[in-house]
C-alpha cells in the first residue's frame, strides 16, 4: 500500500508513515507534483494528535537531534493562514513582552498567505535574525531573539513551493509554531482553525512546555481579538489543559471589529507597529497588542492574572520600555 493510499484510507498513521511523508516533503530531488498530492491529501484528513507530535518531532530531530534548551524561554506566534491580512501583531507583542524581561525566542517566516510575515517586517525594521548557535548570547544581552524559519530549518525551503501552490492552510501551518529550534518553557500560539485547538494544546503538552496558551481569536483570527469571545486552551503548570472563552471587554478594552487590524505592505506594517510602540497609536490596534501581550506575560509567569498582564503591557508601552527594546534590537 502506497503512502498516498494510507493517507487517504487509514484512520491513524504510524510514526514510520509520518517520517516517510516528511522525508518526501523535505527532499530536494522529489517533484512538486508528488509533494502537492501528498500534502494536500494529508491536510484534508482528520489529523490525530499523536500524528502531529510525530511530525513536529520528526522535523526537530532531523535538524536538532540534541535540541538546545534555554530555561525560561518563550515563543509568541500564530499559525498564520487566517486570511485576515492583519498587521504583525505577534511581532509587535514580542517587543513588549521582552521589555518585561521575558526571554523571547520568536520563530518566524516570510508570508505564505498574507502580505507581510514576521521576517518581512524585520527586514523593514533593519533587525537581523539570529543564528541558533548565537541565540543564548543575544538572549542574555537583549532578552529577545528573532530566528528565521528558513535559516533554522533550511529543509523547509523544499516545502515552500508546494505550500504556495496549495494556497491555503495546511498541516504545516500548525507545525510551524511548534518547531522552535529551542526547547521552550512557555508558549503562546494562535491557531487559525478552532477545531485544532485541543490538538495543538495536547501536542504542546507532549513537547514538555511548562505553561502555554493556545487560542483562536473571535471571528476567525489566529490572535486574540477585540471582536467577541476568544477560545482559549490553557496548559497549566500541573499539566492540566483547561478551556474557556475570553472577551476583551471584560478587561476594560473596547469592542472592535477585526477589520481594524488590517495591515498592508511591510512598510505599512512597520509604521503601524512603530506607532503602537512609541505610544502615538491609541486605537484598537494598540488594544489588540495589549491583550495579546497581557496573555503572554501571564503565561510567562510575570504576573498572576491576565488583567495584571494587560496592565503591565500598558505600562511597558507608556513608559517607553517597549520602544527602547525596539531600538536596542536595531543596535541603536
Curated annotation (Swiss-Prot):
Anthranilate 2 binds at residue 163. Keywords: Amino-acid biosynthesis, Aromatic amino acid biosynthesis, Glycosyltransferase, Magnesium, Metal-binding, Transferase, Tryptophan biosynthesis. It is an enzyme of class 2 (transferase). SUPFAM superfamilies: Nucleoside phosphorylase/phosphoribosyltransferase catalytic domain (SSF52418). It comes from the Bacteria. 5-phospho-alpha-D-ribose 1-diphosphate binds at residues 78, 81-82, 86, 88-91, 106-114, 118. Its EC number is 2.4.2.18. GO terms for molecular function: anthranilate phosphoribosyltransferase activity; magnesium ion binding. It catalyses: N-(5-phospho-beta-D-ribosyl)anthranilate + diphosphate = 5-phospho-alpha-D-ribose 1-diphosphate + anthranilate. InterPro entries: Anthranilate_Pribosyl_Tfrase (IPR005940), Glycosyl_Trfase_fam3 (IPR000312), Nuc_phospho_transferase (IPR035902). Catalyzes the transfer of the phosphoribosyl group of 5-phosphorylribose-1-pyrophosphate (PRPP) to anthranilate to yield N-(5'-phosphoribosyl)-anthranilate (PRA). This is Anthranilate phosphoribosyltransferase.
